[in-house]
């Protein structure tokens, strides 16, 4: 028997329960070998810090997020902006009042007409200028078309970055149909330069209304199809529901406006709270959410597109023929027959082109409901031909500043739909 025993005196022929096998001690009583305990000691860990953007496609090329991660949980975030800073406010102070419009086009460049209209209303309020009725309706029509374009872009981009490429293509198709109509009216798809102090640049061409209504019918069909693809999509719902939540109280405290505020349950819309142009004559609803998450912010855009379609159709029904710009040649260029045929017309044209309009001295804050929320212009005039001071309240800035609060404690993957749902546009945020 002694020959059969192996190393350590263990009989290899022994089986459990047989003589010589013995009982195995419980695991808890086994003592570690020398140095083995070090393997089980808790290891100190450090949070990982990663850069998301500015070249990351989900950050739209204009924002850098320095994200601190504990595993996949976001522990903190610092935002680095300024990659698209152009000195908007100072640039506007170096040109005439009428030359500011091309700069406003490049704020929220997806819905530029709203920026045109916002600035024009501020100057007209300071100058106490009443614009023609037809110009009011044309401003509303074009603004609401651009609101639809903006929301289509957000919904399409948000779906694409969650893997639904088809929705993005549908959204871009509908947006391009609307942009084609605006290009026919304004001469540009993106940077419209359509509004003027005292009215609009040009009237709608013959047949434009009928073509626009046909395009709206097609856009309605595409929007409904997008809703069918996303509203009950399990992946989309799981990625958006209960992520990026902001309560009504927090949204107000953080300075939210627009769809993001309404998604949190606060029914504030400038078009209802402080009506401008002809919004007080129109029948439309303000959609309001209850959960304040990414899914509610998506639903806000979908419903607002439906309401914008309703507004545009009412404007076409109510709009009557008439002037599209004031006939006060201190603010608007005289018609070409007067310029070419009278000395008064030549002089008025020359002074407006060379010196710009003279806005009475004073200051004013004017605000409108842009696609992302309250767009405000603070304008100061010293009575000269250029703005003395111009300040901008960008609707997207409070939402972007709140992004670290909205994502703290959530998964890294939740950052993408949250960033998309606030619709940060670098042009308006960084100016």
Curated annotation (Swiss-Prot):
Primary residence: membrane
Cellular localization per UniProt: Cell inner membrane
Pfam families attached to this UniProt entry: Complex1_49kDa
Claim: Cell inner membrane is one of the keywords in the record = yes
Question: What's the Enzyme Commission number for this chain?
Answer: 7.1.1.-
Q: Note the PANTHER family from the entry.
A: NADH DEHYDROGENASE [UBIQUINONE] IRON-SULFUR PROTEIN 2, MITOCHONDRIAL (PTHR11993:SF10), NADH-UBIQUINONE OXIDOREDUCTASE 49 KDA SUBUNIT (PTHR11993)
Family the UniProt entry places it in = Belongs to the complex I 49 kDa subunit family.
Subunit details = NDH-1 is composed of 14 different subunits. Subunits NuoB, C, D, E, F, and G constitute the peripheral sector of the complex.
Q: What is this protein called?
A: NADH-quinone oxidoreductase subunit D 2
Organism in which the protein naturally occurs: Anaeromyxobacter sp. (strain K)
Q: What gene, per UniProt, encodes this protein? A: nuoD2
